[in-house]
Amino acid sequence: MQKKSDDPYERLLLLHLQHYGFLSDNSSGIPIKREWEGIQDSTASDMINSSSPSESSDSNLEEEQEESKPCSNFFSLNKALRTRQLVFDFDGERPIPRLRDPLDLFTIPSTSCPFQGVRWPIECDVICDKIQHIEWDPSEPETFYQPTGNEQTPMPVGEVRGNTVYCIDPATKASSFTYSRVGGSRGPIKSATSCANNQKEPTLAFESRFECGNLQKAVQVGQYDYGLTLRTDLYTTKHTQWFYFRVRNMREGVTYRFTIINLMKSSSLYGAGMCPLLYSEKTAWLKGEGWKRTGSSIRYYRNNIEQDGKALYSLTWTLEFPYDGDTCYLAHCYPYTYSKLQHYLREVISDPVRAAYCKLRVLCRSLAGNAVYVLTITAPSSSLAERKAKRAVVVTARVHPGETNGSWMMQGFLEFLLSDLPDAHLLRETFIFKVIPMLNPDGVVVGNYRCSLAGRDLNRNYRSMLRDSFPCIWYTRNMVKRLLAEREVVVYCDFHGHSRKNNVFMYGCNERKDASQCLQERVFPLMMSKNAKDKFSFRSCKFKMHKSKEGTGRIVMWRLGIRNSYTMESTFGGSTLGDRKGTHFSTLDLKSMGYCFCDTLLDFCDPDPAKMTRCLEELGVLLKQEIRRKLGREVDSLENLSDIDIESSTSGSNSTESDGLPVHLLNVTNQGKKKLLRSRKERNRLRQGRVQSAGKTDASKPYSCQTLNATTQHGDTEDQS
């Protein structure tokens, strides 16, 4: 039995814990104040004065384990100091005080405290259906679509010749984000289905008012032909690439055509054989099969519509649904919702084995109030010196909400790192991992492709001081700054998706000032290509730092002092390498890149320099070959070459489309200034000046209001207007 304490507070706390089932006996592991043998107060003060400085700033970096030691000094110190704010670590027999971890400002998810509901902007209608998909990977890789040359290119016909069967509010219904609530708008959900003409044949029933969905309008232009309009990123008129919506009321054996009419990129992987994705609930139930590549007659082309003076593009494809009356989903890439992330994190913290070395905290709240989670993963340290010797690795994902492949790579990374594999154990013993699996939860929830609810690309605002407008980015950068003040960060990597290039590759930062380090940043990507030969393309990696990309996480972290700072880009399509050439990536393929990242990290930090030396030698040869190909001359030394000589443009995204102030501040600056009304005295003074300049009167004679009024009435000075 637990020995009763004389302290009334301790007795109350004990009863409280017992009442809620957190404490039943001594095996509970919750320390309660005990009576210990007496000790001099001077002994306690001597121990504190001789101990190492408090590591309160490091308390969030790894999972702290309270070790029960048969040492009465520890408890007598607490009693002598009369404080519960200090806890003690032991380096041998020597107690080292540190501040107790502060209570979290936000709720920490746990089995006894469920995750907070998903918050939506108040103007968003949200259906109550719980959308869930099974994870499944095909037994054989799915091949690219091979064009026949006979693909049709239907042009948009508008609502005059078509029948609108689905329509929701546009992204610009509100000019900027105001506030949010769980479940979105208040009151009953408005119907989004309409039918202008009576149809003998049943029409498809569309829906997208759920997490990550973004279909705005569906127009039936033929019996089985539908024109689709995607909703742009919320509070913007740009960024239509990602799509995800539900379809019901279909017929089996009928060929349907879908044409998305408002895509904004001039080129796409759909032109290189990429296929859309289809999920059938009946197929999942009957066969246990999930997302599949689908479609024929696939074509990506420019249509006859313009928006803001820019041409729009269409994606068209045909398909047959497998069952009558099924519920199906169509998507650009494998969806990965905010709720799915919460479900996965709940599993992690509910497992006592993984929870021993994985601490989950809330880094901050997004604009809508959704939690931005950060995981600290490391093995418990046996001593203070061992803890301080660990280097750090920072990994983030999903700053662009439509790049769901980044979340699948992140899940693979976490699955490997939290597993019981020997390599995973070695990684946890060697490093402290700071992981932010979803940087832009608001954008993910509402189905944006690129922006947050500020209407801006977060990956262009890592330098911004606007904490309230870009909280997820501001707190991430601040966390890394504090981490760098305590220990070396060996690698930073942000997981992304790419819409124009196949394979997986990296963007890095080139060291231009130190020629001896010009190859160092290329070693990690080269090792990745060796560990994933049929998926990772080193030749697609770029290391230029464009001025327009100065606000990206990769460059900002590099300027903070992280030499190996990267974004890892995974295609939406598939591979053009090795045995996987011409095949799509599955979710297992994407997760395998997370496994590969962990393997490469061990190779990169191997104490044996042999791998590093071989890679540097190979890089020197490859770089000279590339320069010879581009410049047409031999190069003996790499020291006098700039990155302009070495590589061309990264052909990345156009960052200017979503740069600038947050939308709500932009609207304030665009408001017209009110015209200031002048007083009568000011108007009279101005009128007097005009009279004098006209030379109709004696300039030396002062004019009074009475004289001025008289001359005005006689029309001698100026016209009435």
From Swiss-Prot:
Coiled coil segments of this chain: none
Gene3D superfamilies in the cross-refs: 2.60.40.3120, Zn peptidases (3.40.630.10)
Region feature (Disordered): 43-71, 645-721
Skewed-composition ranges (Basic residues): 672-688
EC number(s) recorded for this UniProt protein: 3.4.17.-
BP terms from Gene Ontology: protein side chain deglutamylation; proteolysis
InterPro entries reported in the protein's UniProt record: Cytosolic_carboxypeptidase (IPR050821), Pepdidase_M14_N (IPR040626), Peptidase_M14 (IPR000834)
Catalytic activity: (L-glutamyl)(n+1)-gamma-L-glutamyl-L-glutamyl-[protein] + H2O = (L-glutamyl)(n)-gamma-L-glutamyl-L-glutamyl-[protein] + L-glutamate
UniProt-annotated binding residues for Zn(2+): H400, E403, H496
Cellular component terms per the entry's GO annotation: centriole; ciliary basal body; cytoplasm; cytosol; microtubule cytoskeleton
Cofactor(s) the record lists: Zn(2+)
Domain Peptidase M14: 334-605
GO molecular function: metallocarboxypeptidase activity; tubulin binding; zinc ion binding
Biased composition (Low complexity): 50-59, 647-660
Location within or outside the cell: Cytoplasm, Cytosol; Cytoplasm, Cytoskeleton, Microtubule organizing center, Centrosome, Centriole; Cytoplasm, Cytoskeleton, Cilium basal body
Main location: cytoplasm
SUPFAM superfamilies documented for this protein: Zn-dependent exopeptidases (SSF53187)
Entries under PANTHER family matching the protein: CYTOSOLIC CARBOXYPEPTIDASE, CYTOSOLIC CARBOXYPEPTIDASE 2
Function: Metallocarboxypeptidase that mediates deglutamylation of target proteins. Catalyzes the deglutamylation of polyglutamate side chains generated by post-translational polyglutamylation in proteins such as tubulins. Also removes gene-encoded polyglutamates from the carboxy-terminus of target proteins such as MYLK. Does not show detyrosinase or deglycylase activities from the carboxy-terminus of tubulin.
Name the UniProt record assigns to this protein: Cytosolic carboxypeptidase 2
Organism: Danio rerio
GN (gene name): zte25
